[in-house]
Amino acid sequence: QRTNDFIKACGRELVRVWVEICGSVSWGRTA
């Protein structure tokens, strides 16, 4: 259970960072 919660939290953090990077790359291209 603890491992599952850790994986979920880690996944959310990774997605948040990935979206930020992807967003900045997209903005950089359009600008």
Curated annotation (Swiss-Prot):
One of its GO terms (molecular function) is hormone activity. The keyword Secreted applies. The modification Pyrrolidone carboxylic acid is found at residue 1. InterPro entries: Insulin-like_sf (IPR036438). It is found in: Secreted. Keywords: Disulfide bond, Hormone, Pyrrolidone carboxylic acid, Secreted. Heterodimer of a B chain and an A chain linked by two disulfide bonds. This is Relaxin B chain. It comes from Phocoenoides dalli dalli (Dall's porpoise).
